[in-house]
Amino acid sequence: FQTNRGVSLVQRLALQDERNRRNKLSCIWLLRYGIHRGKALFKNVARDIVYLPVYYTSDGLKPLASPFLLDTDGKVIVLKGDTLNRQQLKLYRKYPPSDNAYAMGRRIVGGKIQAANRADFSDSVTIYRVPEWKSAYSLKVTTDTAWRYWRYLSAENGLCNIAELVFYQRDSMRPIVGEIIGTEGSCFNDPNHVKEKVFDGDPLTFFDAPTGSGAWVGMDFGKEVNIGKLIFIPRTDGNMIQLGDTYELYWWGPEGWQLIGGPRIARDVVLEYLAPSNALYWLRDVSRGREERIFTYSDGKQIFW
């Protein structure tokens, strides 16, 4: 609660009855509130935060007005979802990464996806070089050339920190598997961080190689295969979109949280929705986890609050 940057906020809200007047508050649980001349008065309100005006009833919390952002300049920006003008959302996370998760995940930047027909990768070609950090990567392979060996080659000083690597043959939605190959061992000889963890289906486990640079992990498919798509995940906190999990996306409307569409099973590491614009959103992972956070969407990116 940032009282050092606080401002006084008078929010003009329609008061439905005397009972509601006594029960008004603005979520994130403001410490001080009250009614003054028909207006809700909140003092020492922190900036750069989204607020949800609600009131209590016997049935729980009810929306009183649209959410709003109090920006760094003290300006109120109302987040009233527009159902007539919808926007396309591409969602990669349900919760923002911590500084540590971001720092560990960035070790993938500069890493390479390579393919070869020789076991020593002396004839390898680089299919993709990771230019920037993302929560997860969904890569369409444009070359039609078939290769037997595929791998992820660590970035410089990256310790080959990769959590998951999934291959799909062209025009197939089912992963293809082969023999796991790559650098043997792990940092400090930890059996929980060996190369096999990259293919265990658990994004919270990862390969931590015994050497900072030059380590790699991949698969020998036993024959040349035409890979059309790869999904790979850097070292992560588990709050990205997880394959096979069921998700629900909500937006804050006149009746509170409203489900967009219905539950959706993640077939990729990005979820796409057509949603009301200028709204406040909430993405739930129904399958697991507890960390979730509201967000807005601007310039093609999620902005968590």
Residue ranges and their predicted role:
Residues 24-46, 137-138, 265-271:
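Short, solvent-exposed S/T- and G/P-enriched segments that are highly enriched in secreted/extracellular
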Residues 50-52, 147-151, 280-282:
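Short, conserved beta-strand segments of beta-strand-rich sandwich/propeller modules, principally
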Residues 71-146, 157-227, 235-242, 273-277, ...:
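Disordered, acidic Ser/Thr/Pro-rich linker "stalks" and the adjacent N-terminal cap
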